[in-house]
């Protein structure tokens, strides 16, 4: 069921965070580390994980020290990565940076997108403890359409059933 798909997202996240290339980029001495063939191969790996999993809309790792992102779209500073994903509009960049990149959320969480829209994200960081500043932050955006399709499949066809998503902070959706 749905749990299986969410678990797959979590295991992809672990695989990417523990990847040697993530360790290299976390301790990058300068910004040129983000334009190496290895960094681009890492981006390709994310692209392949996305292609293999219809639940995943986007995957990227954020490196706060350099304000740089390596993701399915390539390797860019956070602003340019956002522009690439938003049809070159910078509207919403500040919110995205504070709600997603610099969020305190760990694991699955919903973030407001627009007026009545919420989007499901998965977020992990290294180090995992909040006492130290994160060196790398992994974000996976969940594909809403696919998520809703799975919810529909999980629901029996009578009208009296509800499905709840309970986050680790005990937030109910």
Predicted regions and their residues:
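Solvent-exposed, extracytoplasmic
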Residues: 41-53, 128-173
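Signal-transducing coiled-coil linker helices
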Residues: 31-42
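Extracytoplasmic/periplasmic ligand-binding sensor regions of membrane-associated signaling proteins
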Residues: 50-141
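Amphipathic coiled-coil signal-relay and dimerization helices
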Residues: 24-26, 67-75, 170-173
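Short intrinsically disordered, low-complexity coil segments enriched in acidic
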Residues: 1-7, 13, 42, 125, ...
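Juxtamembrane extracytoplasmic/periplasmic/luminal helical "stalk" adjacent to the first N-terminal
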Residues: 1-29
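Short hydrophobic alpha-helical segments used for membrane anchoring or interfacial signaling
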Residues: 18, 59-67, 162-171
